[in-house]
A protein has these predicted regions:
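Outer membrane beta-barrel
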Residues: 99-124, 138-256, 261-262, 306-309, ...
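Signature for the C-terminal beta-barrel architecture of outer-membrane proteins
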Residues: 82, 96-101, 129-131, 170-172, ...
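Short glycine/proline- and charge-enriched loop/turn segments
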Residues: 130-134, 213-220, 373-376
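Sec-dependent signal peptide recognition
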Residues: 1-8
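Outer-membrane beta-barrel transmembrane domain signature of Gram-negative proteins
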Residues: 119-141, 356, 486-490
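Hydrophobic h-region of N-terminal signal peptides that target proteins for export
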Residues: 8-16
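Outer-membrane beta-barrel pore domains
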Residues: 87, 309-501
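N-terminal periplasmic/intermembrane-space "pro-region" immediately following the signal or transit peptide
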Residues: 16-127, 501
């Protein structure tokens, strides 16, 4: 015979003594639940750490389970980055966005995702016309839509791939003016111990997908086309023991899409065409010349990385080589070569990365911009001359801290970075940039706070001596990656608020 619960409960309530015991039991149960929640958070942090260690070990062994862009991008950083935000790749530098809790919308082997990002920018901006170069922030407009991203990822047996398209707000035009472009479009196949990608994919050059950088603005390697460079071609990756190798052939750059510029509505920095020219005194005339400049063709890339150590202590030493033909318009054809040596050290959650790069362009000295030591390069719908030969040292230090005690934050990664563009031309002023910042992540939210201090970066301030600003009517009137005639240290604070889905 089953006793009715009410029959048992009523006498007990009449006596009154079990009530304090019940309250005590409820309180003890609540304490146990809270303790279990904390233990679960700690376990999740340990699992993420073990996952990262497993990735490094698989990559070092050349295993096919570590695909060439693992984990897959949901956006990037990194970005980037210019105004970017790309992601982790096969390289050993962590990306600018690691979102462990984001579950994309999935149909069969296809994942649908994207991102929406907003910028707050403040810094050394004096003019009321943000159209003077790609300041992306000024005294007139501090807050703006940064990026809208749609992405499609494929993972079906040995086949994998990615499609990503981006829209950017144009701060130099009235809302809703914008430019947009294809970021990536490639299909890959995994073999037993190697893999192949075909399409618009990331060129395997340097220590990581964004040089050695973790920051929103990247390091200066990006602005000369040697980091996070998306081009059209084939990329093959394989491993042997502690070695990992990449080889690539790229027919062309990723191309120009929708914007106001002649050839620069694109994500990655490339040699481009423009409709501008300069006289022998360096005075620039915008839109007055036939299309002139260069386009990349038949690029060859090699990279080798050796891994030392395992688990929480490891080092990755490598070298990269690159050669590109340049198809001239209005000028004779040219070429470019580049090399880099790079090292990344990991100690628990600390990471120290360094890279030394060298590049040289061989171009026609008789050109419409009348400057043999400059070449037009463009991205983000803006082109401007860059030095044709330079050394590029870059270094970064970062630490990932798992915030298990803070329920609204998964992790924070503070970082310090420095890079320089040491130009061969004696009359040019070198470009330098130092950045301090942090990445903040929770669920689908990813926030970057950056304070960049730079001399010679068109994305960091526009102030000149006195009350002046960058003067784009002259080749030597701008704080840039070319002549850097402004020669002034400026700062830029960026708060980038992104939601990834």
């Amino acid at each position: 015979m089953r006793t009715a619960p009410v029959a048992v409960l009523l006498p007990s309530l009449c006596l009154g003594s079990p009530v304090p015991d019940l309250e005590r039991r409820v309180s003890d149960l609540a304490d146990q639940v809270e303790q279990s929640r904390r233990e679960l958070q700690d376990l999740e942090a340990r699992l993420r750490s073990a996952r990262e260690d497993l990735i490094r070990a698989l990559q070092a062994d050349g295993a096919s389970e570590a695909p060439a862009d693992w984990p897959a991008e949901l956006e990037t950083s990194p970005e980037g980055g210019g105004d970017a935000g790309p992601v982790p790749s096969d390289e050993v530098i962590a990306g600018d966005r690691e979102l462990d809790d984001v579950e994309p919308f999935r149909i069969g082997p296809l994942d649908f995702g994207g991102a929406l990002r907003v910028n707050f920018v403040n810094g050394s901006y004096r003019n009321d016309d943000p159209g003077q170069g790609p300041s992306r922030g000024s005294t007139e407009r501090n807050v703006e839509l940064d990026t809208f991203v749609v992405e499609l990822a494929l993972d079906y047996g040995p086949w994998f791939g990615e499609f990503q398209y981006r829209w950017y707000a144009d701060s130099s035009q009235d809302f809703p003016a914008s430019y947009n472009f294809l970021h990536s479009l490639w299909l890959g196949y995994r073999f037993d111990a190697s893999e192949l990608q075909a399409g618009i994919n990331r060129v395997p050059f340097g220590a990581g997908p964004f040089g050695v950088s973790q920051s929103y603005l990247y390091d200066l390697t990006y602005y000369v086309g040697l980091a996070d460079d998306m081009d059209l071609g084939l990329r093959y990756a394989w491993g042997s023991g502690d070695w990992r190798f990449d080889a690539g052939y790229y027919l062309s750059s990723e191309g120009h899409y929708n914007g106001r510029s002649a050839d620069s509505a694109r994500y990655s920095y490339d040699a481009v065409l423009w409709k501008d020219q300069a006289d022998e005194d360096g005075n620039v005339s915008f839109g007055t010349a036939p299309r002139n400049g260069y386009r990349e063709r038949n690029q060859l890339v090699l990279r080798a990385v050796r891994t030392f150590g395992r688990d929480r202590i490891s080092a990755h030493l490598g070298a990269s080589l690159l050669y590109t033909e340049l198809d001239g318009t209005g000028v004779n054809d040219g070429s470019r070569w580049a090399m880099a040596v790079h090292a990344v050290g990991n100690l628990s959650d600390w990471q120290l990365a360094a890279q030394l790069s060298r590049y040289e362009y061989d171009i026609d000295p008789d050109n419409p911009w009348n400057e043999p030591d400059l070449i037009p390069m463009g991205a983000f719908d803006f082109a401007w001359p860059v030095a044709t030969a330079a050394w590029l040292p870059a270094i970064s230090l970062s630490h990932r801290y798992e915030t298990t005690a803070i329920p609204w934050l998964d992790y924070v990664r503070p970082y310090l970075e420095y890079s320089a563009l040491l130009k061969d031309a004696a009359r040019f002023t070198d470009s330098q940039m130092a950045t301090a910042g942090a990445q903040w992540s929770h669920g689908g939210w990813f926030i970057v706070t950056d304070l960049a201090y730079s001399n010679g970066n068109i994305f960091v301030g526009n102030s000149a001596s006195g009350d002046g600003t960058d003067d784009y009517s002259r080749l030597d009137g701008v704080g840039d990656f070319g002549i850097n005639g402004n020669d002034r240290w400026n700062y830029r604070f960026t708060l980038n608020l992104g939601y990834y889905f």
